[in-house]
């Protein structure tokens, strides 16, 4: 008997947070990662989660430029209306620190530069999972 993959419909921020909670709980992380989830134009999540490990420091300008090219390639493959969403996970307790906010700023900027649709970036630590809205990320100094 095969198990059905997890494919929720994500149309709102609440649904996105619920999907991330389902995928990340129980919380507790041994390293810093960036997680990518693809959402189809109809809001259905693709049954594949991508993890980029060792994402400790926010990307440099050169790394962000490479990521923009990667996102452009994905945008072309996903087609119109698809979007890519992100969650940063790391060990430790509490809400966002300056590096988390720098990661969120970088992800928002890369998506904007690549023309890739995205939603609110999320952060998961050992004891919390929270959204990092663009206005909050941009309000913090670089």
What are these regions (language model features)?
Residues 1-2, 100-142:
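Divalent-metal-activated hydrolytic enzyme cores
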Residues 31, 78-79, 114-115:
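A structural signal for short coil/turn segments at secondary-structure junctions
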Residues 37-39, 87-89, 122-124:
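Short beta-strand segments
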